Swiss-Prot record:
Segments in the Cytoplasmic topological domain: 1-21
Annotated S-S bridges: C64-C80, C97-C178, C158-C171, C252-C273, C285-C294
Physiological role: Synthesizes cyclic ADP-ribose (cADPR), a second messenger for glucose-induced insulin secretion. Synthesizes the Ca(2+) mobilizer nicotinate-adenine dinucleotide phosphate, NAADP(+), from 2'-phospho-cADPR and nicotinic acid, as well as from NADP(+) and nicotinic acid. Also has cADPR hydrolase activity.
Segments passing through the bilayer: 22-42
PANTHER family according to UniProt: ADP-RIBOSYL CYCLASE, ADP-RIBOSYL CYCLASE_CYCLIC ADP-RIBOSE HYDROLASE 1
Gene encoding the protein: CD38
Record protein name field: ADP-ribosyl cyclase/cyclic ADP-ribose hydrolase 1
Membrane topology annotation: Single-pass type II membrane protein
GO cellular component labels: endoplasmic reticulum membrane; intracellular membrane-bounded organelle; plasma membrane
Subcellular localization: Cell membrane; Microsome membrane; Endoplasmic reticulum membrane
Tissue: Osteoclasts.
Organism name: Oryctolagus cuniculus
Glycosylated sites: N98, N118, N177, N207, N268
EC number: 3.2.2.-, 3.2.2.6, 2.4.99.20
Membrane topology, Extracellular segments: 43-298
């Protein structure tokens, strides 16, 4: 058999040189790939989380003192430090996705406040206007005008099984894998209590600039309306408000309001609806005095 010897063809490189090139490329690219993977992981985690409010405990205590000492001195006997401790005990050192209504029950039992009959105002997708209205009509109470609603409004909080402190970083979003967050369960519990305590004629402010003014997926549609007691509440007035200059997508004649009326009537509660309730419309027109729809009111 002939003894052939193959030499590298023109342009070929020895295998050792190619191995060195591969190592150099890996040395340059691998850190970039790892950094990208970490960044994607962090981004995914942040997308499933929301920023916890810094210094939640201090804010809750401060708001409680402001509310009971200045805004509603008739509640001066409420122990704000005890309220804070009971509030945080509901979720600290616990799985942030597995909070229960029972966790907040001691807080509900502790805070006693009576909203006068005929002064309860619910809202759905109209928070800003409802608060502006109740801010002028001081005798009206939205949930956030009560002590428990006031101390927690616009805050985000949660705990961690690994620590006894309130978490100051990120809290999980409420989703199908985390449906019982500390914040969402709190609002469900206090919303239920707010509705159960209502009496006489109650009111709800709805947003007719949305496709559906009433939604059974909202807190009002899923919790509050079903916890109105017919032996305490005899009438529900709905105010369907529309944005100044906006599109009127729903009204008292719409299908969603008919659904609300059916739910309320089945609970033996009378129902009335009014589009663009005049006193609330005046509040809207403060910011748009020159708009034709506001000029008509003057």
């Amino acid at each position: 058999m002939p003894d052939y010897e193959f030499s590298p063809a023109s342009g070929d490189r020895p295998r050792s040189w190619i191995s060195k090139q591969v190592l150099i490329v890996l040395g340059v690219c691998l850190p970039v790939i790892l950094a990208l993977a970490i960044w994607v992981g962090v981004l995914t985690w942040r997308q499933s989380s929301m920023g916890a409010t810094d210094h939640v405990s201090a804010i809750v205590l401060g708001r409680c003192l402001t509310y009971t000492r200045n805004m509603h001195p008739e509640l001066r006997n409420q122990d704000c430090k005890k309220i804070l401790n009971t509030f945080t005990s509901a979720f600290v050192s616990k799985d942030p996705c597995n909070i229960t209504k029972e966790d907040y029950q001691p807080l509900i039992d502790l805070v006693t406040q009576t909203v006068p009959c005929n002064k309860t105002l619910f809202w759905s997708r109209s928070k800003e206007l409802a608060h502006q209205y109740s801010g002028i009509q001081k005798e009206m109470f939205t949930l956030e005008d009560t002590l428990l609603g006031y101390i927690a409004d616009n805050l985000v909080w949660c705990g961690d099984p690994r620590t006894s402190e309130v978490k100051e970083e990120f809290c999980p979003y409420r989703n199908e894998n985390c449906s019982s967050t500390a914040t969402s369960v709190f609002w469900t519990v206090v919303s239920q209590k707010f509705a159960e305590s209502a009496c006489g004629t109650v009111y709800v402010m709805l947003n007719g600039s949305r496709t559906t003014a009433f939604s059974k997926a909202s807190t009002f549609g899923s919790v509050e309306v079903f916890n109105l007691h017919p032996d305490r509440v005899h009438t529900l007035h709905a105010w369907v408000m529309h944005d100044i200059g906006g599109v009127e997508r729903d009204s008292c004649l719409g299908s969603s309001i008919k659904e609300l009326k059916s739910i309320v009537n089945q609970r033996n509660i009378s129902f009335f609806c009014q589009d663009d309730y005049r006193p609330a419309r005046f509040v809207q027109c403060v910011r748009h005095p020159e708009h034709p729809s506001c000029s008509v009111l003057m």
